[in-house]
Design a protein with these regions (language model features):
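N-terminal export signals
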Residues: 1-27
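Bacterial Sec signal peptide processing site at the extreme N-terminus
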Residues: 20-40
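Signal peptide-directed extracytoplasmic domains
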Residues: 74-121, 125-126
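Acidic helix-start/capping segments at beta-turn-to-alpha-helix junctions
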Residues: 69-92, 141-145, 155-157, 260, ...
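Short, solvent-exposed loop/turn and secondary-structure capping segments
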Residues: 84, 150-154, 194-195
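Export/targeting segments at the very N-terminus of extracytoplasmic proteins
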Residues: 49-64, 105-143, 153-154, 162-171
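Short acidic, glycine/serine/threonine-rich helix-capping segments at coil-helix boundaries
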Residues: 323-328, 336-380
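Extracytoplasmic and endomembrane cell-envelope/extracellular-matrix remodeling and assembly machinery
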Residues: 35-57, 62, 67-71, 75-76, ...
């Protein structure tokens, strides 16, 4: 999640804390716990240990039992990498064109359609109960954790206690830590299974602990609200419950790309020269999940694609380097054909493409910039 970004978490976007999760560009590690980098393993820190002692008193004063604290903090500890990630967040902004290309990539759409079909009965039951479009719920799932594949493996007790101790947003994260302990105390999850992102976002749809407390649903009826389970039912129902409580209107779409006809809602054009979108009240409800306009458009567009719609019909202007999407795809294809693998040709310039450009430039004795350009494209013809 993003603190002000998202209430639930992107799956795609920038790091922040919103409702249940994350943001606009990348995703979490899928490594096994033993594969976590060293800086995300507990490290000795006497000041942290002393803080935990004082925190225990405050937690017990709020109804957390000594037994819960003992169990939850067994094996927990200070994670230096969490502090580093919190302090080194950068404002990395993609264009809307790039963001939507990632959010509704062919692979994400294909996986989304498969997930939608596989969990159709559950999704339709959730839609019947809440009124929230099953495709919207599926799209949020896809952006937040790639349909459950990238939920994060960092212990939530360690992550939130580290951030509460570190102090930059100590009061906020102490509330999240207390909420996480209540979840354990309630029996929804064992502390050892409560894992998520470095910021404490959890489960299939990347819920922060306080949001879990207020909105989590035991859809399966097993007595636990398990948003981490291989069965995503509780997590999907929780996401729908959040949207319902924030004003989702049954039977109303999120909006549409405005290609023809008169608008019926609020028209937005997030990227100058790009497509316009006619948005509804439900679009604004999605923004309660994550206030990023790009995120909400990503959810809506991915949901449409999961439902069988095609790509956007409108075009975007050339980028800052003078390249259109087709130019960027051609550049990636030509670099790969020359032996400089860009790891795919989607028109999005990322680190793989920049590395391939740099390697090509070095092989030709050119200044190594890693920057795409029309001249570079022409040289590859």
């Amino acid at each position: 999640m993003q603190m002000n970004r998202r209430l639930f978490g992107l799956g795609l976007g920038s790091l922040g804390l919103a409702a249940c999760s994350r943001s606009v560009t990348a995703r979490m590690s899928t490594a096994e716990p033993e594969g976590l980098p060293a800086d995300l393993l507990p490290a000795s820190n006497r000041a942290y240990d002393a803080w935990v002692v004082s925190f225990r008193e405050r937690a017990m004063g709020q109804g957390i039992t000594s037994a819960t604290l003992n169990t939850a903090f067994q094996g927990a500890g200070f994670l230096p990498g969490v502090v580093t990630r919190d302090q080194n967040q950068t404002e990395f902004r993609r264009t809307l064109e790039d963001y939507l290309a990632i959010a509704a990539s062919d692979e994400r759409v294909e996986k989304g359609r498969a997930a939608y079909a596989r969990h159709r009965r559950t999704l339709f039951a959730i839609e019947e109960n809440t009124g929230v479009d099953a495709k919207i719920v599926t799209a949020i799932w896809g952006l937040e954790s790639y349909y459950g594949e990238r939920q994060g493996l960092i212990p939530v007790i360690s992550a939130t206690s580290t951030l509460a101790f570190e102090g930059r947003r100590g009061r906020y994260f102490e509330r999240e830590l207390i909420a996480a302990l209540r979840i354990v105390q309630n029996g929804d999850i064992q502390a050892s299974r409560m894992t998520g992102s470095w910021a404490g976002a959890m489960g299939h749809t990347q819920c922060m602990p306080t949001v879990f407390q207020e909105y989590a649903v035991d859809f399966t009826g097993d007595g636990r609200r398990d948003i981490w389970s291989e069965d995503p039912s509780d997590a999907l129902a929780t996401t729908a419950a959040y949207l319902e409580r924030h004003g989702w209107v049954r039977g109303m779409s999120w909006g549409r790309e405005l290609v023809s006809g008169s608008p019926s809602g609020t028209v937005i054009q997030p990227q100058a020269g790009g497509p316009q979108f006619d948005t509804t009240r439900n679009f604004r409800v999605i923004k309660r999940y994550n206030p990023s306009e790009a995120y909400a458009l990503g959810v809506g567009h991915l949901a449409d694609r999961i439902g069988g719609a095609g790509p956007l019909r409108g075009s975007f202007p050339p980028d800052a380097n003078g390249l259109t999407k087709n130019d960027r795809i051609a550049l990636q294809e030509r670099l790969t054909a020359r032996g400089f693998d860009t790891q795919g040709a989607d028109g999005v310039i990322g680190s793989n493409t920049e590395s391939a450009i740099s390697a090509y430039q070095a092989s030709r004795g050119l200044p190594v910039t890693g920057t795409p350009s029309q001249a570079l494209l022409q040289s590859l013809r």
